[in-house]
Amino acid sequence: NYAKDFQYAKSAAFGENYNNSNEKGLFIGANAKILPKFVLAGYFDSFTFPWLKYQVSAPSHGFDYFAQLNYTPTKSIDMYFRIRTKLKPVNTPEVVDRIDYLVDANRTNYRFNVSYAANSQWKFVNRVELITYKKGDAATSNGYVFFQDVKYKPQGLKLSIIARYMLFQTESFDARVYTYENDVMYANSIPFFSGKGSRFFALVNYEVNRNIELWVRYAQTYFTNPNVFILTNSGSLDTVIGNKKS
């Protein structure tokens, strides 16, 4: 329970908002081993905003639920299926009598992920994810992402290589896809993508000795349409001249 006038200068407590104010909620989560090789996890999060917030010009209420089923048939194979739905009111783009009114925005993610180790040197990860987004009475927009990861760590060498090839397509920016990417030490990378295209990245790590490590990373995104606008992690618009961004 965070009051709407709570001052959050140095707080970073749990909540739906990025700041700890103007929010009441209830979160319930559970994790259970239902069978010898199956684990079921999930949560339900209900949240209420007693006062106005960004892009929401009235008090509002929403919920977020998540369920994931893990199956581990062997020590070298792990797979899971996940579904997550978040519903929260937002301002409609239409203004009636100079008043913004709220409509429900529903975003649902369906994900299937498989990771398997061929041996001690090679590991592979496959993922396919579908996103649906519906706002008010507007048509549902969809998006998808598919990627293949390859991880190689040769025996006898303090070297590791990770590479990914990904395909993505979305019908709108609201149906954009997020993916975590391995990065150099102390860097965090969770980019998002909209439109249609592909992406590749490779990360190489070599341990020279116990005090020195070398990291090299290269990534490139290819867009089907040239001269596209993308939203960067900082929230500003960036123009890609051509159809490649490295």
Predicted regions span which residues?
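Exposed, low-structure sequence patches enriched in small/polar residues
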Residues: 1-246
